[in-house]
């Protein structure tokens, strides 16, 4: 199995540690004035979601995690599991709440998302960077509202609440950045 040396550590790298797959969130190289250099690493367990801090001596290595990132289509949720399907093979997967996490507020049925699979089980479901969602509830706009004004909360079709400019009305389609949860623009029809 391939491995990664501390010099190859970077954010997003998937590694195996203590029998579990982890992803590197942060990596800081430290060279003290006296003594050996080391890497201070923040890792997230892909199975449990727990975040841990570890230090590795310069030159240490970790085994590469045998995880696959693939594009799957979100089909539906039955309350306990989110069901996903491969558009090529039509193979279906069930992801639990821990794997989906905050992605639930950005995913609607038939959306394509990036799924991290380990031993055939979904560990992490990531929505696309930008999604187009419909406004289902917001305060009515008042005459004279411009883009330079303030903002108001708007509820989207998935239940997510985002801050939008005052001129946005119910029924409009909005482009949302899922990484920050912020309004980007009105969607082009």
UniProtKB/Swiss-Prot annotation:
User: Which BP terms from GO are recorded?
Assistant: peptide biosynthetic process
UniProt entry keywords in alphabetical sequence: Cytoplasm, Elongation factor, Hydroxylation, Protein biosynthesis
Q: Name one Pfam family in it.
A: Elong-fact-P_C
A Gene Ontology cellular component where this protein is annotated is:
cytoplasm
Query: Which superkingdom does the taxonomy of this entry point to?
Result: Bacteria
Write down which residues bear the modification named N6-(3,6-diaminohexanoyl)-5-hydroxylysine: 34
This chain belongs to the protein called Elongation factor P
Q: Which family does it belong to?
A: Belongs to the elongation factor P family.
Q: How is it modified after translation?
A: May be beta-lysylated on the epsilon-amino group of Lys-34 by the combined action of EpmA and EpmB, and then hydroxylated on the C5 position of the same residue by EpmC (if this protein is present). Lysylation is critical for the stimulatory effect of EF-P on peptide-bond formation. The lysylation moiety may extend toward the peptidyltransferase center and stabilize the terminal 3-CCA end of the tRNA. Hydroxylation of the C5 position on Lys-34 may allow additional potential stabilizing hydrogen-bond interactions with the P-tRNA.
Q: Where in the cell is it found?
A: Cytoplasm
Q: Which InterPro entries match?
A: Elong-fact-P_C, NA-bd_OB-fold, Rib_uL2_dom2, Transl_elong_fac_P/YeiP, Transl_elong_KOW-like, Transl_elong_P/YeiP_cen, Transl_elong_P/YeiP_CS, Transl_elongation_fac_P
HAMAP family, sorted: EF_P
Involved pathway(s): Protein biosynthesis; polypeptide chain elongation
What CDD domains does its record include? S1_EF-P_repeat_1, S1_EF-P_repeat_2
What PANTHER family does the annotation carry? ELONGATION FACTOR P, ELONGATION FACTOR P (EF-P) FAMILY PROTEIN
**Function statement:** Involved in peptide bond synthesis. Alleviates ribosome stalling that occurs when 3 or more consecutive Pro residues or the sequence PPG is present in a protein, possibly by augmenting the peptidyl transferase activity of the ribosome. Modification of Lys-34 is required for alleviation.
Single GO molecular function:
translation elongation factor activity
